[in-house]
Amino acid sequence: MAPKLQAQFDAVKVLNDTQSKFEMVQILDENGNVVNEDLVPDLTDEQLVELMERMVWTRILDQRSISLNRQGRLGFYAPTAGQEASQLASQYALEKEDYILPGYRDVPQIIWHGLPLTEAFLFSRGHFKGNQFPEGVNALSPQIIIGAQYIQAAGVAFALKKRGKNAVAITYTGDGGSSQGDFYEGINFAAAYKAPAIFVIQNNNYAISTPRSKQTAAETLAQKAIAVGIPGIQVDGMDALAVYQATKEARDRAVAGEGPTLIETMTYRYGPHTMAGDDPTRYRTSDEDAEWEKKDPLVRFRKFLENKGLWNEDKENEVIERAKADIKAAIKEADNTEKQTVTSLMEIMYEDMPQNLAEQYEIYKEKESK
């Protein structure tokens, strides 16, 4: 005998029908060919080249950062190779007045949003100056607590709306972050108040070593938007054009007062979760890695630009050499930054130092002068 409710309301059918509507949006296939002309963004040739330059530069930064970490010259570092399209194409769709609330893997976005590379290196080293962003860089320090940036983004977006700013707040997390309570609280608050926010889930298939299949029964992560009443979209995160267009349209909606959007980018990290001892060979197969390497966002976008006559090996080598020079100069500047002291940390905590800390400050100041 069929359940009584099912005769009038088949909840399973509703679920299946809903999930089937979340098809991954793609503009460029793995060979760099346009598969959906109608969705190609209105970017000039110069902008397309600039986006490619940023992706190449960032891949070199990732390689050098891993090397510097192994040398003991950088502290905490989360590799980014494989996620350049998800990170940089979304940032490229922003305006200077927009705010970025990054996770710990999202340093490239805030670098291209104005953060000096030296500051990024100091952040990795745990130096307080790595958290003191220059005036005009609309970004918060990378969030270490997984998912907490979603609450912060909702708050920043709400403030932008209250102040009548024509700007948005964008934040990022991985698939693992979408399992956190902060994720739901953030998107629900932003949805309820139509705050101008863009929530990006970079679905790289693993929360450290936990596969996505062990995190949720949902067929997509984009469909989680339905529960709070906002649009959700799943895009090919290895396709720079698809990521850009999805982010641009989400931004247009947000500044028009239509509220937030949830974007799931299907991507992959080629390296370990972080350089703090993670070994991806323990939970990923070489066959899986090989399949995703065929989808490399740089290779795909390179082929697209080469077909348009906008990119060649000489141009790429120029960017690589420039990246190496930039990194060398920035790490040298970081090396020459004065060491932090107890008093230097206390000086930046309060505008008016409490009496009990002021007394301790004088004690440490005397010790440090010896």
UniProtKB/Swiss-Prot annotation:
Presence of the UniProt keyword Oxidoreductase in the record: yes
Keywords carried by this UniProt record: Oxidoreductase, Pyruvate, Thiamine pyrophosphate
Single Gene Ontology BP annotation: branched-chain amino acid catabolic process
Reactions the enzyme catalyzes: N(6)-[(R)-lipoyl]-L-lysyl-[protein] + pyruvate + H(+) = N(6)-[(R)-S(8)-acetyldihydrolipoyl]-L-lysyl-[protein] + CO2
Catalytic activity, EC: 1.2.4.1
SUPFAM superfamilies: Thiamin diphosphate-binding fold (THDP-binding)
Cofactor dependency: thiamine diphosphate
Listed Pfam families: E1_dh
InterPro entries the record matches: Alpha-ketoacid_DH_E1_comp, DH_E1, PdhA/BkdA, THDP-binding
MF GO annotations: pyruvate dehydrogenase (acetyl-transferring) activity
Known partners and oligomeric status: Heterodimer of an alpha and a beta chain.
Biological function: The pyruvate dehydrogenase complex catalyzes the overall conversion of pyruvate to acetyl-CoA and CO(2). It contains multiple copies of three enzymatic components: pyruvate dehydrogenase (E1), dihydrolipoamide acetyltransferase (E2) and lipoamide dehydrogenase (E3).
This protein's name: Pyruvate dehydrogenase E1 component subunit alpha
Organism in which the protein naturally occurs: Staphylococcus aureus (strain Mu50 / ATCC 700699)
